[in-house]
Amino acid sequence: MAALSSAAVTIPSMAPSAPGRRRMRSSLVVRASLGKAAGAAAVAVAASAMLAGGAMAQEVLLGANGGVLVFEPNDFTVKSGETITFKNNAGFPHNVVFDEDAVPSGVDVSKISQEEYLNAPGETFSVTLTVPGTYGFYCEPHAGAGMVGKVTVN
C-alpha cells in the first residue's frame, strides 16, 4: 500500500539582509506517493542537488522575436559547469560556433561548437563550459549581419 510522503528542502541564503527588511527563504516542497519512507529521502536529496548544483541553465534565443538576427541575450555570464541552451527562435537556419581566437587557452572549439544548422523553431543545442574565461561565438550564416555573442564563465 502506497503512503503519501513529503519532503522539504531549504536552501539557506548567505546574503545578509538589510536592517528592517524581512529575509526571504528559498524552499522546495515535494509531495509524492511513495511505497517507502526512504523514497521521500531520495526525492529530497535529488531536489537539493537540483537546486544547489549545476541545474541552473542559461537559455539563449537564436533570433529575436521580431525576426532580428541576434543572439538574445548576446552578452551574459554563467558559472563553470552551468548548461547553456541555444534555442532556434525562428525558421532561419542557425548554428553556434565558438571562435578559436576568442576562447580561453587550451579550449578545443570543435568540442563545444554546433556547426550543424538548427533549422526549425524550437530546435536546441546545449553546451556546458567548465574553463573560466570569456568565450566569443557566432552564427556562421549570419555573423556578417551581427549575430555574434560573448559568454563569460566564472
Swiss-Prot record:
Domain Plastocyanin-like intervals: 58-154
One term under GO cellular component: chloroplast thylakoid lumen
Disulfide linkage: none
CC cofactor: Cu(2+)
Primary location class: plastid
Transit peptide: 1-57
Record keyword Chloroplast present: yes
Keyword vocabulary terms for this entry: Chloroplast, Copper, Electron transport, Membrane, Metal-binding, Plastid, Thylakoid, Transit peptide, Transport
PROSITE patterns in alphabetical order: COPPER_BLUE
Its membrane topology: Peripheral membrane protein
Gene Ontology molecular-function annotations: copper ion binding; electron transporter, transferring electrons from cytochrome b6/f complex of photosystem II activity
Short name of one Pfam family: Copper-bind
Top-level taxon of origin: Eukaryota
Ribosomal protein in keyword set: no
Binding annotation for Cu cation: 94, 139, 142, 147
Transmembrane segments annotated in the record for this chain: none
Entries under InterPro entries matching the protein: BlueCu_1, BlueCu_1_BS, Copper_blue_Plastocyanin, Cupredoxin, Plastocyanin
Role played: Participates in electron transfer between P700 and the cytochrome b6-f complex in photosystem I.
Recorded family membership: Belongs to the plastocyanin family.
PANTHER family named in the record: PLASTOCYANIN MAJOR ISOFORM, CHLOROPLASTIC-RELATED (PTHR34192:SF10)
Name of the molecule in the record: Plastocyanin, chloroplastic
Naturally occurring in which organism (per UniProt): Oryza sativa subsp. indica (Rice)
Underlying gene: PETE
